[in-house]
Amino acid sequence: MPTHDDVDAFLTRTLVGSDPILDAALSAQHAAGLPSIEVAPVNAKFLHLLTRIAGARRVLEIGTLGGYSTIWFARAVGEGGRVVSIEAESANADVARANLRRAGVADRVDVRVGRGADVLPTLEGEEAFDLVFIDADKESNTLYLDWAARLGRPGTVVVLDNVVRGGDVADADTTDSKVQGARRGILMLGSDPRFDATALQTLDRKGWDGVALAIVVDAGEAGAGS
């Protein structure tokens, strides 16, 4: 009986395949001692296709790590597009920048180093983002969602990663700060009138998790939208 790992391997092999640039990015990330918490290949291609489906030309990524998903976004926005990626750790950002140069997409990516809470306000007044991907410290999910709406516009796509946490997101009594952050994010998406959202559970080699998908329906008066 095939396992979910077998299915993940089959889908990756069949729908994603092998890419020397992306493989090198992961190798460089691991060689630098970064944690193996990047999005899985099938999920990365999902984000890539979602970006293309949305026609996104400006993408905001909160949580760069080694730049693996950043490369996927940069390829999706194409020439003339722009990806702004925020990374709290300067060592991670250095690895990401090297990976982006190797991938030939560094000219369309701006990696900004600092805590999301500090960097996001500096983006106010810039052109609105078409898609926002949130994959950083889970405790700050609601802060990042608020900024996603403020820096977006009606129609901006928002993706919030790691929202199921092995099913623990359904536990209202959890004391795990990451799970609490995931819960607060889901509750905000379900109650904040600026968003229309849903969520999907995922099961792959990294285990049981999920992703929330939303669109901004009203950026609000504080928004930086066009």
Give a label for each model feature.
Residues 1-133, 138-159, 163-226:
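A short alpha-helical cap/connector motif
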